[in-house]
Amino acid sequence: MNALNQAHCEACRADAPKVTDEELAELIREIPDWNIEVRDGHMELERVFLFKNFKHALAFTNAVGEIAEAEGHHPGLLTEWGKVTVTWWSHSIKGLHRNDFIMCARTDKVAETAEGRK
């Protein structure tokens, strides 16, 4: 079991530190299916989840929305027919915080039981 998917987010202020290169190398191993993307000069974590249809993709989007609301940390979500792209980063620090890795792991946990996964 991944310890990250059991962790909770901490409040992240604009002066919170971004993950260091060492932390990044360690944490990314915990979420091997996620990709690091650089957009607008900052790193983001992104993964595409495939589903059998739009209804299942939308249900997964809503489930991710529920954990985001519970933790007070919100992703970018793009819901399409049979596909959901989830992107985590910390807006307040314009980069990656430990919270983002926690939420990737928690998203993976939601995906394990999501109906209609391909």
Swiss-Prot record:
What is this enzyme's catalytic activity, as reactions? (4aS,6R)-4a-hydroxy-L-erythro-5,6,7,8-tetrahydrobiopterin = (6R)-L-erythro-6,7-dihydrobiopterin + H2O
Q: Does the keyword Transport apply?
A: no
- Name the domain of life this protein comes from: Bacteria
GO BP annotation list: tetrahydrobiopterin biosynthetic process
A single MF term (Gene Ontology) = 4-alpha-hydroxytetrahydrobiopterin dehydratase activity
Catalytic class of the enzyme: lyase
Q: Which UniProt keywords apply?
A: Lyase, Tetrahydrobiopterin biosynthesis
Q: Does the keyword Thylakoid apply?
A: no
Please state the Enzyme Commission number of this protein.
4.2.1.96
A Pfam family that this protein carries is Pterin_4a
Write out the similarity annotation.
Belongs to the pterin-4-alpha-carbinolamine dehydratase family.
**Role according to the record:** Involved in tetrahydrobiopterin biosynthesis. Seems to both prevent the formation of 7-pterins and accelerate the formation of quinonoid-BH2. May also have a positive regulatory role in the expression of phhA.
Q: Which NCBIfam families match?
A: PRK00823.1-1 (NF002016)
Q: Which PANTHER family match?
A: PTERIN-4-ALPHA-CARBINOLAMINE DEHYDRATASE-RELATED
Task: Please give the name of this protein.
Answer: Pterin-4-alpha-carbinolamine dehydratase
Q: Which organism is it from?
A: Pseudomonas putida (strain ATCC 47054 / DSM 6125 / CFBP 8728 / NCIMB 11950 / KT2440)
